[in-house]
Structure formats: C-alpha cells, structure tokens
Amino acid sequence: MVRRIFVEKKPAFAVKAKELKNEMSEYLGIEAEDVRVLIRYDIENVGDETYEKAKGTVFSEPPVDDLYEETFPCKEGDFCFTVEYLPGQFDQRADSAEQCVCLLNDAEHPIIKSATTYVISGVKSGKWKVESEWQEAVVKHCVNPVDSRRADGPKPATLEDRFD
C-alpha cells in the first residue's frame, strides 16, 4: 500500500515559498497573494508503527512543519502543480528518508519517492492576458527539464520500478 504525505513549512519558516514568490515577481512579472511549497512523500513497505514514528521524526519537524496525509488544504482557484525527478535520476531526499526509516526498523525495506508541490494563490494577471500563460511560465520556471518533470497524476498503486 502506498501512503502519501505532504509536508509544508509553517509560514514563519517558509523560506523557499517566499523566495519563489519574489522570483515570480522579479523575473516573470507575476504578482501572487500567496505561494506555498510542500514536499510530497510517497511511501511503501512501511508498517503502521514505523510509519507513525517516521511522520514526526523522518518526514517532518513538528515545531516548524505542518504534515498532511493523502491530501492538503487548498482554496478553489489555487493553481497547484507537482514536480518530480525523472526516472533514474537520483533523489537524495527520498534516499535519506529511506535510510532513516531503516534506522527506525531495520526489518523493513521502504520504498520512498519525493516530489515538490507548488500552490499559487491570488494571481493578478498584469502583463499576462490568459491565465494559462502565466501558469505555463511558472511551471517552466520551476521545472528543470534536465532532471525533473511535471507530475500531477494520481497516486501510484506501487512505487516499485518496473522495466518492460
């Protein structure tokens, strides 16, 4: 069974979100009311007890992070998209999480994949005539096509890599 967690820095600690909001304004001319950055973890082969321990130790720091399971709150009209590493690309965050979960229970062999989810709220069009144009510009700014891609599909049934 694949479990999904989203981890977001609390507003006072959301440095990456503030940086992206400034970059959108300065480089793209897009003014947004709010920008959120969440780290998405898909987790498989982890028992319930280990999973509960890992939520507050491996995947998040409770004093500075908000953790959401399976989905996260967003408002109608928010533009949400997710960026993941290309298949075969090394994912250091996921690898570190796998190693840390193994320290909690060395009998388990977790498979973890991470991605970054962006939520853009309250954009004032400005120079952009069509909503899809500014959305495309933001996605292009956040996705490095050399190592990553947009990943907005449903949660996978398994995280095991299959090579046909």
What are these regions (language model features)?
Residues 1-164:
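Core nucleic-acid recognition elements
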